[in-house]
């Protein structure tokens, strides 16, 4: 899911998500194969994050482009944990040195800094988490606000369903994109979980409308 939560792996533990991602817009399909999202716990409330993917882009009538996407480095800090959980998760995203992926349309051209906050609360077996924040960038197209709401429930032991609405908007709030996602988590073992999600744009005035978003991954906890 796009909306983050305040959870961390725990001191000295890894949480590694390896996935196939897809995004379809009119005349274009972008695939991340694989996307790697690696997390490491420092103490009980800190998480270090590294994320990147190998992207494949096919535009109608053109050749397929492929290459390493941008890189994300992030730190999550859960600063409140007493029924209500609160965290902040600043993340810096940049094009890898020497890469021309931005010129080939595989990633954004300018570095950016997203500073979001996350909130989570459990209501009798239904957990609700939301995030909200701002993206700083020299590129006005990348700059703007983000926010999301995700509701989840464990319908049987080891099987969770999630419903999410996540949005982003321009700096002046005159253009926005809202995405609807349905996801599930299924435990494969005590240390691994299958992650699935499918979604699409509800509205998009920032660019081409996404008709399909997909995520198929496995989380391994070490």
Residue map of PLM features:
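Transmembrane beta-barrel domains of Gram-negative outer membranes and organellar outer membranes
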Residues: 1-222
């Amino acid at each position: 899911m796009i909306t983050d939560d305040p959870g961390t792996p725990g001191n000295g533990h890894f949480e590694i998500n390896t996935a196939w991602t897809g995004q379809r817009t009119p005349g274009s399909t972008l695939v991340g194969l694989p996307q790697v999202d690696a997390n490491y716990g420092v103490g009980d409330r800190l998480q270090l994050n590294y994320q990147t993917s190998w992207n494949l882009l096919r535009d109608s009538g053109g050749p397929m482009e492929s290459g390493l996407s941008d890189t994300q480095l992030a730190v999550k800090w859960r600063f409140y944990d007493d029924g209500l959980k609160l965290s902040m998760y600043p993340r810096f995203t940049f094009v890898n040195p020497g890469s021309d992926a931005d010129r080939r349309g595989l990633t954004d051209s300018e570095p950016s800094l997203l500073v979001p906050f996350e909130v989570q609360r459990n209501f009798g077996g239904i957990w609700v988490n939301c995030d909200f924040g701002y993206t700083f960038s020299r590129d006005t197209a990348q700059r703007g606000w983000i926010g999301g709401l995700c509701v989840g429930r464990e319908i049987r032991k080891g099987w969770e369903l999630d419903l999410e609405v996540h949005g982003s908007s321009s700096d002046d709030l005159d253009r926005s994109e809202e995405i609807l996602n349905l996801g599930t988590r299924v435990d494969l073992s005590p240390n691994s979980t299958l992650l699935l999600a499918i979604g699409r744009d509800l509205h998009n005035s920032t660019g081409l409308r996404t008709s399909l978003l997909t995520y198929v991954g496995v989380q391994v906890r070490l």
